[in-house]
Regions:
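Concave beta-strand-loop units of leucine-rich repeat
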Residues: 1-11, 17-36, 41-65, 70-90, ...
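Extracellular/mature segments of secreted proteins
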Residues: 197-200, 222-223
Length: 223
């Protein structure tokens, strides 16, 4: 079920009045709040459950939401997946530093998300979304790198990265990764043959990647 749903509040600018703590049995949904700038009152929540779709935390279409530090109390292994989508003002994922695992992560259509900072301690995605993916990063136009994922080792399902037009490389993702099923990676500015080889060695399913043939694309990217 869902323990907290903040949805379709056109005027709500802050959740300062919330005072929740400890463990929430269900999921948290923060969706379609066009004026919400500040998430507060959740810092003492350490654990959340999941909804019937297996989603633990969904932050969707909050156009002016400045950050996710309101979730900094979350620790350990989340009971479901995390979906961060359509939040135009977010620049990073600061707030998840104490999270070490989730079933899956979907990070899509966050126009000003420059970095995945906040996911540095995530080591495992041990489930799949309905498409069979454990990690989906799509259409984040400002995203530059995946360096925050250097500790990520185990991905139980697929990896889908596409449409992040400023993504320089996925070196950070490759660094610690030991397993995944299918891998689909496109539109990365520097994606080399050695990157393809690395994914081919660890993936148990199809590897569908777009290599960059331009030498200049990888200059200055440590290739």
């Amino acid at each position: 079920g869902v323990s907290l749903a903040i949805t379709d509040n056109r005027q709500l600018a802050t959740t300062q009045g919330l005072a929740m703590s400890g463990k929430l049995e269900g999921a948290v949904h923060i969706m379609s709040n066009p004026s919400l700038k500040v998430l507060a009152g959740l810092q003492a929540v350490s654990e959340i459950g999941a909804d019937v779709q297996g989603v633990a935390l969904k932050v969707y279409l909050n156009n002016v939401l400045e950050n996710l530090v309101g979730f900094k109390g979350l620790t350990g292994d989340l009971a479901g997946s995390v979906e961060i989508s359509g939040n135009a003002a977010l620049t990073d994922l600061d707030g998840f530093q104490s999270v070490t695992a989730a079933t899956a992560a979907t990070i899509t259509n966050n126009a000003n998300l420059i970095t995945l900072h906040g996911l540095e301690n995530v080591k495992t995605f041990d489930g799949e979304d309905p498409k069979g993916n454990s990690l989906t990063i799509r259409t984040n136009a400002a995203l530059v790198d995946a360096n925050a994922l250097q500790e990520l080792a185990v991905v139980s399902g697929g990896i889908d990265i596409d449409g992040n037009t400023n993504l320089q490389n996925v070196a950070g993702l490759i660094k610690g990764l030991t397993s995944a099923t299918k891998v689909s990676i496109h539109n990365v500015i520097c994606f080399s043959t050695s990157d393809e080889t690395a994914f081919s060695l660890l993936a148990t399913g199809d590897v569908n990647v777009e290599k960059v043939t331009s030498v200049t694309a990888c200059e200055g990217n440590g290739k």
